[in-house]
Amino acid sequence: MSDSASPIFVEYRNTDLLLSPSSAHVYYLPVSSDKHIMLTASTTMGAVPLTTSTTPLVSSTVHQTVFRLRFDSAVTRLTPVTTTTSVTTGTLPWYIYQTPLVEIINTTRVTIGAPYDCDGFFWGRELRPNPDISGVGVVFAFMLSAWLVWLITVYAFARGQIDASQVTSADTRFFRVQVKSSGWRWSSVFLRAILVFSDQQLVTGIAIMIATFASCQDISVWHYAFAVSLAWVSHQHYCSLKTQHCVLD
């Protein structure tokens, strides 16, 4: 199999074959958004020699098929050709072309421009970042306020710096919470801190929802689902805070 005289077979499965309008025997294999491989063949079932060209890609027909290529041992590398941007109006946009899935049958001496991975299953436009919805600052603001509220609550219960009216029999029996005499003073301080962080998260959630609905036509489904998740976190935080107010009242 490693002999240099052995032929090389490369198989493209479920590949978009772009048929050239000028010749029925010229095919283009798209490799990326700006590269392609041009093939010439008398039939799609026999031996197919490889040729490259810088001719602008103007295609009118797309074929889905399994395309097997046979190369001589002298071929050691297949290099995609960069195409020009003179694609005529009305042709399919570049971003819907699927990257070929390449399978080497009996040798690994050939390197195809398309990698042997799952890139061929990614259809549609590339996902662009949206810092207004899923930026580092937005996520950090949400997580920071949530963790600070949790740490303040745990510290208050562990140190007994809470109001006696907030301690239940379950807290005393299972968690052995002991309320100190000066707990009511620190309890008001901790409660105000929790209110500040909760208000911050609520305002941030409202701002994210406004930004999401303002750009609803341009954002991706993933960013919309991410914004809905952040809004759910803000809603749950607000409901927990209102429950605490009802208990205190």
UniProtKB/Swiss-Prot annotation:
Name of the protein in question: Elsinochromes biosynthesis cluster protein HP3
Keyword terms of this UniProt record: Glycoprotein, Membrane, Transmembrane, Transmembrane helix
Q: Which InterPro entries match?
A: Elsinochrome_Biosynth-Asso
Transmembrane stretches in the record are 138-158
Cellular component terms per the entry's GO annotation: membrane
Q: Gene behind this chain?
A: HP3
User: Could you tell me the membrane topology recorded for this protein?
Assistant: Single-pass membrane protein
* PANTHER family the record matches: INTEGRAL MEMBRANE PROTEIN
